[in-house]
Amino acid sequence: MKDYLVKALAFDGEVRAYSVRTTNTVSEAQRRHDTWRTASAALGRSLTAGTMMGAMLKGDQKLTIKVEGNGPIGPILVDAHANGDVRGYVTNPHVDFEGTEQGKLRVYQAVGTEGFVTVIKDIGMREPFIGQSPIVSGELGEDFTYYFAVSEQTPSSVGVGVLVNGDDSILAAGGFILQIMPGAQEETISFIEERLQKIPPVSTLIEQGLSPEELLYAVLGEDKVKVLETMDVQFNCTCSRERIESVLISLGKTELEQVREEEEETEVHCHFCNERYKFSKEDITNLIENL
Protein backbone atom coordinates (compact mmCIF):
# COMPACT_ATOMS: atom_id res chain seq x y z
CA MET A 1 0.00 0.00 0.00
CA LYS A 2 1.29 3.46 -0.86
CA ASP A 3 1.59 6.28 1.65
CA TYR A 4 -1.13 8.89 1.47
CA LEU A 5 -2.93 11.47 3.57
CA VAL A 6 -6.61 12.21 4.06
CA LYS A 7 -8.16 15.58 4.88
CA ALA A 8 -11.64 15.40 6.34
CA LEU A 9 -14.34 17.13 8.34
CA ALA A 10 -16.39 15.42 11.02
CA PHE A 11 -19.52 16.16 13.02
CA ASP A 12 -20.83 18.56 10.36
CA GLY A 13 -17.71 20.70 10.40
CA GLU A 14 -17.19 20.82 14.16
CA VAL A 15 -13.97 18.81 13.79
CA ARG A 16 -11.18 19.10 11.22
CA ALA A 17 -9.28 15.85 10.77
CA TYR A 18 -6.11 14.61 9.10
CA SER A 19 -4.93 11.03 8.85
CA VAL A 20 -1.89 9.55 7.15
CA ARG A 21 -0.05 6.33 6.41
CA THR A 22 3.72 6.91 6.49
CA THR A 23 5.12 3.37 6.55
CA ASN A 24 7.11 3.78 3.32
CA THR A 25 8.16 7.32 4.21
CA VAL A 26 9.55 6.29 7.59
CA SER A 27 11.15 3.19 6.03
CA GLU A 28 13.03 5.42 3.59
CA ALA A 29 14.21 7.66 6.44
CA GLN A 30 15.32 4.61 8.44
CA ARG A 31 17.22 3.24 5.45
CA ARG A 32 18.96 6.52 4.70
CA HIS A 33 19.94 7.30 8.29
CA ASP A 34 20.44 3.76 9.63
CA THR A 35 18.35 4.59 12.69
CA TRP A 36 18.04 2.05 15.48
CA ARG A 37 14.62 1.09 16.84
CA THR A 38 13.91 3.83 19.37
CA ALA A 39 15.49 6.49 17.16
CA SER A 40 13.33 5.22 14.27
CA ALA A 41 10.20 5.57 16.39
CA ALA A 42 11.11 9.12 17.43
CA LEU A 43 12.01 10.22 13.90
CA GLY A 44 9.01 8.41 12.42
CA ARG A 45 6.54 10.02 14.81
CA SER A 46 8.03 13.44 14.03
CA LEU A 47 7.91 12.83 10.26
CA THR A 48 4.30 11.68 10.57
CA ALA A 49 3.24 14.75 12.55
CA GLY A 50 5.20 16.98 10.18
CA THR A 51 3.52 15.46 7.12
CA MET A 52 0.07 16.25 8.51
CA MET A 53 1.08 19.74 9.65
CA GLY A 54 2.54 20.41 6.21
CA ALA A 55 -0.79 19.39 4.67
CA MET A 56 -2.42 22.24 6.59
CA LEU A 57 -0.43 24.69 4.44
CA LYS A 58 -1.12 25.78 0.85
CA GLY A 59 0.74 26.13 -2.44
CA ASP A 60 4.51 26.20 -2.01
CA GLN A 61 4.36 26.88 1.73
CA LYS A 62 6.52 24.77 4.02
CA LEU A 63 7.41 24.34 7.69
CA THR A 64 10.30 23.14 9.80
CA ILE A 65 9.87 21.27 13.08
CA LYS A 66 12.66 21.11 15.62
CA VAL A 67 12.31 18.86 18.67
CA GLU A 68 15.07 19.69 21.13
CA GLY A 69 14.90 17.46 24.20
CA ASN A 70 17.50 16.59 26.81
CA GLY A 71 17.71 12.93 25.73
CA PRO A 72 20.58 11.14 23.96
CA ILE A 73 18.96 11.29 20.53
CA GLY A 74 19.69 15.02 20.28
CA PRO A 75 17.61 17.42 18.18
CA ILE A 76 15.14 16.04 15.62
CA LEU A 77 14.59 18.17 12.50
CA VAL A 78 11.78 17.75 9.99
CA ASP A 79 10.96 19.77 6.86
CA ALA A 80 7.45 19.36 5.44
CA HIS A 81 5.79 20.89 2.39
CA ALA A 82 2.16 21.48 1.48
CA ASN A 83 2.53 19.06 -1.45
CA GLY A 84 3.20 16.03 0.77
CA ASP A 85 7.00 16.02 0.57
CA VAL A 86 8.78 15.51 3.89
CA ARG A 87 12.36 14.94 5.01
CA GLY A 88 14.06 14.74 8.39
CA TYR A 89 16.82 13.40 10.58
CA VAL A 90 17.84 12.75 14.16
CA THR A 91 21.19 14.02 15.40
CA ASN A 92 22.15 10.65 16.90
CA PRO A 93 20.49 7.81 14.94
CA HIS A 94 22.11 5.00 16.95
CA VAL A 95 19.95 5.18 20.07
CA ASP A 96 17.87 2.30 21.36
CA PHE A 97 16.36 1.28 24.69
CA GLU A 98 14.72 -1.92 25.84
CA GLY A 99 10.96 -1.71 25.34
CA THR A 100 8.33 -2.09 28.01
CA GLU A 101 6.84 -5.48 28.89
CA GLN A 102 4.11 -4.70 26.34
CA GLY A 103 6.77 -4.15 23.66
CA LYS A 104 6.31 -0.38 23.55
CA LEU A 105 9.47 1.55 22.68
CA ARG A 106 10.56 4.09 25.28
CA VAL A 107 10.65 7.09 22.97
CA TYR A 108 10.62 9.54 25.87
CA GLN A 109 13.97 8.19 27.06
CA ALA A 110 15.52 8.93 23.67
CA VAL A 111 13.91 12.35 23.23
CA GLY A 112 14.05 13.49 26.84
CA THR A 113 11.32 14.98 28.98
CA GLU A 114 12.63 18.54 29.07
CA GLY A 115 13.15 20.89 26.16
CA PHE A 116 11.10 22.51 23.41
CA VAL A 117 9.13 21.85 20.24
CA THR A 118 9.63 24.68 17.75
CA VAL A 119 7.69 25.09 14.50
CA ILE A 120 8.80 27.58 11.85
CA LYS A 121 6.29 28.20 9.04
CA ASP A 122 7.31 29.82 5.77
CA ILE A 123 3.96 31.01 4.47
CA GLY A 124 5.17 33.68 2.05
CA MET A 125 5.19 36.58 4.51
CA ARG A 126 8.19 38.79 5.12
CA GLU A 127 8.85 37.06 8.44
CA PRO A 128 8.18 33.37 9.16
CA PHE A 129 5.70 32.32 11.83
CA ILE A 130 7.55 30.80 14.78
CA GLY A 131 5.72 28.89 17.50
CA GLN A 132 7.25 27.12 20.47
CA SER A 133 6.05 25.02 23.38
CA PRO A 134 7.75 22.96 26.08
CA ILE A 135 8.09 19.21 25.80
CA VAL A 136 5.55 17.65 28.17
CA SER A 137 6.27 13.92 27.90
CA GLY A 138 8.86 13.19 25.21
CA GLU A 139 6.44 10.72 23.56
CA LEU A 140 5.85 13.33 20.82
CA GLY A 141 2.12 12.81 20.20
CA GLU A 142 1.34 14.55 23.49
CA ASP A 143 4.02 17.14 22.78
CA PHE A 144 2.50 18.10 19.42
CA THR A 145 -0.95 18.14 21.02
CA TYR A 146 0.34 20.62 23.59
CA TYR A 147 2.05 22.67 20.87
CA PHE A 148 -1.27 23.22 19.07
CA ALA A 149 -2.98 24.24 22.32
CA VAL A 150 -0.25 26.66 23.41
CA SER A 151 1.17 28.10 20.19
CA GLU A 152 -1.80 27.97 17.82
CA GLN A 153 -4.65 28.09 20.37
CA THR A 154 -6.30 25.14 18.62
CA PRO A 155 -7.63 22.32 20.83
CA SER A 156 -6.26 19.21 19.12
CA SER A 157 -5.43 15.57 19.58
CA VAL A 158 -2.34 14.21 17.84
CA GLY A 159 -1.86 10.46 17.59
CA VAL A 160 1.32 9.19 15.93
CA GLY A 161 2.78 5.70 15.97
CA VAL A 162 5.61 3.64 14.52
CA LEU A 163 6.07 -0.12 14.81
CA VAL A 164 9.65 -1.31 14.34
CA ASN A 165 10.75 -4.89 13.60
CA GLY A 166 13.60 -6.58 15.47
CA ASP A 167 15.92 -6.00 12.49
CA ASP A 168 15.22 -2.23 12.69
CA SER A 169 12.98 -2.24 9.59
CA ILE A 170 9.66 -0.40 9.78
CA LEU A 171 6.52 -2.51 10.09
CA ALA A 172 3.93 0.28 10.23
CA ALA A 173 3.74 4.04 10.70
CA GLY A 174 1.03 6.67 10.58
CA GLY A 175 -1.18 8.91 12.61
CA PHE A 176 -4.02 11.40 12.91
CA ILE A 177 -4.66 14.97 14.00
CA LEU A 178 -8.10 16.03 15.20
CA GLN A 179 -8.81 19.73 15.68
CA ILE A 180 -11.87 21.14 17.42
CA MET A 181 -13.35 24.07 15.51
CA PRO A 182 -14.80 27.16 17.22
CA GLY A 183 -18.40 26.60 18.23
CA ALA A 184 -18.11 22.84 18.59
CA GLN A 185 -20.68 21.35 20.97
CA GLU A 186 -19.67 19.91 24.32
CA GLU A 187 -21.31 16.62 23.36
CA THR A 188 -18.97 16.34 20.37
CA ILE A 189 -15.90 17.02 22.48
CA SER A 190 -16.97 14.50 25.13
CA PHE A 191 -17.69 11.86 22.48
CA ILE A 192 -14.21 12.26 20.96
CA GLU A 193 -12.52 12.18 24.36
CA GLU A 194 -14.28 8.91 25.19
CA ARG A 195 -13.37 7.35 21.83
CA LEU A 196 -9.72 8.33 22.22
CA GLN A 197 -9.63 6.56 25.58
CA LYS A 198 -10.90 3.32 24.05
CA ILE A 199 -9.04 2.92 20.75
CA PRO A 200 -5.83 0.85 20.46
CA PRO A 201 -2.50 2.60 19.75
CA VAL A 202 -2.27 4.17 16.29
CA SER A 203 0.54 1.88 15.15
CA THR A 204 -1.55 -1.17 16.11
CA LEU A 205 -4.45 0.05 13.97
CA ILE A 206 -2.13 0.61 11.00
CA GLU A 207 -0.51 -2.80 11.50
CA GLN A 208 -4.00 -4.27 11.25
CA GLY A 209 -4.15 -2.84 7.73
CA LEU A 210 -6.39 0.16 8.37
CA SER A 211 -6.20 2.82 5.68
CA PRO A 212 -6.06 6.53 6.64
CA GLU A 213 -9.83 6.75 6.05
CA GLU A 214 -10.47 3.69 8.20
CA LEU A 215 -8.23 5.12 10.91
CA LEU A 216 -10.49 8.18 11.12
CA TYR A 217 -13.57 5.94 11.11
CA ALA A 218 -12.09 3.98 14.04
CA VAL A 219 -11.51 7.17 16.01
CA LEU A 220 -14.61 9.19 15.10
CA GLY A 221 -17.14 6.75 13.66
CA GLU A 222 -17.67 6.21 9.92
CA ASP A 223 -21.01 8.01 9.85
CA LYS A 224 -19.42 11.14 11.35
CA VAL A 225 -16.57 11.59 8.81
CA LYS A 226 -16.69 13.38 5.45
CA VAL A 227 -13.49 12.91 3.42
CA LEU A 228 -12.58 16.07 1.51
CA GLU A 229 -9.29 15.23 -0.18
CA THR A 230 -6.53 12.65 -0.42
CA MET A 231 -2.90 13.27 -1.39
CA ASP A 232 0.23 11.18 -1.79
CA VAL A 233 3.04 11.72 0.72
CA GLN A 234 6.68 10.71 0.46
CA PHE A 235 10.19 11.21 1.81
CA ASN A 236 11.72 13.63 -0.67
CA CYS A 237 14.79 15.80 -0.16
CA THR A 238 15.27 19.05 -2.05
CA CYS A 239 19.05 18.71 -2.21
CA SER A 240 20.84 18.04 -5.52
CA ARG A 241 24.32 18.34 -6.97
CA GLU A 242 23.26 21.50 -8.78
CA ARG A 243 22.09 23.09 -5.52
CA ILE A 244 25.33 22.17 -3.78
CA GLU A 245 27.29 23.68 -6.67
CA SER A 246 25.33 26.92 -6.23
CA VAL A 247 26.23 26.95 -2.53
CA LEU A 248 29.91 26.39 -3.32
CA ILE A 249 29.87 29.15 -5.94
CA SER A 250 28.39 31.52 -3.35
CA LEU A 251 31.58 31.11 -1.30
CA GLY A 252 33.41 33.23 -3.88
CA LYS A 253 36.61 32.79 -5.87
CA THR A 254 39.10 33.32 -3.04
CA GLU A 255 37.54 30.76 -0.70
CA LEU A 256 37.07 28.21 -3.49
CA GLU A 257 40.73 28.54 -4.45
CA GLN A 258 41.63 27.89 -0.81
CA VAL A 259 39.40 24.79 -0.78
CA ARG A 260 41.11 23.54 -3.95
CA GLU A 261 44.55 24.04 -2.41
CA GLU A 262 43.77 22.32 0.90
CA GLU A 263 41.52 19.41 -0.13
CA GLU A 264 42.16 16.56 -2.55
CA GLU A 265 38.42 15.98 -2.58
CA THR A 266 35.66 18.16 -1.18
CA GLU A 267 32.64 16.38 0.32
CA VAL A 268 29.33 18.06 1.16
CA HIS A 269 26.90 16.14 3.35
CA CYS A 270 23.12 16.73 3.41
CA HIS A 271 21.94 15.99 6.95
CA PHE A 272 18.30 15.61 5.90
CA CYS A 273 18.76 12.70 3.49
CA ASN A 274 22.34 11.59 4.30
CA GLU A 275 23.40 12.04 0.67
CA ARG A 276 27.06 12.88 0.15
CA TYR A 277 28.28 14.95 -2.81
CA LYS A 278 31.94 14.74 -3.77
CA PHE A 279 33.88 17.34 -5.76
CA SER A 280 37.37 16.76 -7.14
CA LYS A 281 39.99 19.49 -7.61
CA GLU A 282 38.95 19.57 -11.27
CA ASP A 283 35.30 20.08 -10.27
CA ILE A 284 36.28 23.00 -8.03
CA THR A 285 38.41 24.47 -10.84
CA ASN A 286 35.41 24.34 -13.19
CA LEU A 287 33.29 26.16 -10.62
CA ILE A 288 35.97 28.86 -10.24
CA GLU A 289 36.16 29.30 -14.01
CA ASN A 290 32.41 29.81 -14.17
CA LEU A 291 32.51 32.69 -11.70
Curated annotation (Swiss-Prot):
The record ties this protein, via SUPFAM superfamilies, to: Hsp33 domain, HSP33 redox switch-like
Query: In which family does this protein belong, per the annotation?
Result: Belongs to the HSP33 family.
Q: Describe the processing and modification events after translation.
A: Under oxidizing conditions two disulfide bonds are formed involving the reactive cysteines. Under reducing conditions zinc is bound to the reactive cysteines and the protein is inactive.
Q: Which InterPro entries match?
A: Heat_shock_Hsp33, Heat_shock_Hsp33_C, Heat_shock_Hsp33_N
Q: Which UniProt keywords apply?
A: Chaperone, Cytoplasm, Disulfide bond, Redox-active center, Zinc
Provenance organism: Bacillus anthracis
Q: What is this protein called?
A: 33 kDa chaperonin
According to its UniProt record, where is this protein mainly located?
A: cytoplasm
Q: List the disulfide bonds.
A: C237-C239, C270-C273
GO annotation, biological process:
protein refolding
Q: Name any GO cellular component annotation.
A: cytoplasm
The record, for HAMAP family, names: HslO
Check the record and name the Gene3D superfamilies matching this protein: Hsp33 domain, HSP33 redox switch-like
Question: What does it do?
Answer: Redox regulated molecular chaperone. Protects both thermally unfolding and oxidatively damaged proteins from irreversible aggregation. Plays an important role in the bacterial defense system toward oxidative stress.
Short name of one Pfam family for this protein?
HSP33
Q: Which GO terms describe its molecular function?
A: protein folding chaperone; unfolded protein binding
Q: Which domain of life is it from?
A: Bacteria
| Location(s), subcellular | Cytoplasm
Q: CDD domains given for it? A: Hsp33
